[in-house]
Every structure is written in structure tokens, then in C-alpha cells.
């Protein structure tokens, strides 16, 4: 289990646009951290950098003091408005992802489906899922490998009160398991009720701790 993630002066440029500027952040295991800010402020890009989906232009990203290749962190990520294969069932989508990543077992998939409350509908095609059900399935794929680091981008969008409570419960359970949990949200209740530390991002800059 990764004990600490450190971002040192992370900057990300796309063309002539600077999306992230000199981001410094340290996160420790068993804690829930929050990032808030307006749409387009850089929250999702920061998540993508930590997950390894994009590389920073400058700066260091360290896991227990090591680079990604040496540390080989297990990272689960739930990105807002992401999608899966529409003609596959929820369970089939998870099995496909598991076969690609080669980290989750059938038991892990079963556990994730139960935890997000999709057992009654896991054989329904993704196309027929409601927005809330799609969010739950995306959460399931993020947690099914019991990640060291769990990144959640607006996880409570498009879900009802019961779903919000479920997301909060899973975040707390993952932190209790020892994971580092990072939540990006503009929902004040999510941020205030769950996170030990909250950071504000504006125009790619981490301005202050709330």
C-alpha cells in the first residue's frame, strides 16, 4: 500500500495554454482530500496527471518518494462523464477492464458490484443504465482493484440522496482500508463533510486551503 503521494511544482501546458501551474501537494494514506473550484479550473487535469493518464510538463510526481515506474502504484479513477461499452452489461464491462488491467479477480468484481448496489441490474446493458447507475458502475471500476490511491471526479453528480450517501460511505471505507482518497467536487456538502484537507484551484493554480 502506498503511504504518501507528493506533487512537487507540477505544471501542465497544452499548446500555449497553461492548465496547471506549480502545484504542490502531499497526501498521506488513510486520509480523504478535497479539491474544489469552478468548472475548467484544472481539477480534472490534476486527477489525470496523478493517475498517469497524462504527463506533467514540468515537476515531479512521487509515490513514497519514488517515480511511477519504480513505485508501480495501484490507482483507481472515476472521471466525470466517462463511458464504457454501451452494448455490454455492467458486469461484462468490469470483466473486460479486469482482463486488460490484470489486477482484479471475479471475486473483486462481485464485491465492487455489491458495494455500489448494482447487483439487481449488473446484467443490463450499459446503454440502458440511468445516469445514476452509470455513475455507480464507474465507481465500481475505480474500487474493484482495491487501489492504493482513489481519485474521484465529481462522483455525486446525477445521483440521488441515497446514492450520495453510498458514495460517501465507500470513500470512508476506502480511507479506513488505508487508501489515499482525493475528491474533486464543487458540491460544498461533499467537501465539508468528508475531507480532512480541502484545496481551492483557480485557473490551474492552487490558491489556498479552505
Predicted regions and their residues:
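Conserved ABC transporter NBD signature motif
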Residues: 59-71
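Conserved ABC ATPase "signature" region
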Residues: 95, 106-122
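Catalytic Walker B motif of ABC-type/P-loop ATPase nucleotide-binding domains
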Residues: 150-154
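Helix-to-loop junction immediately C-terminal to a conserved catalytic motif
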Residues: 51
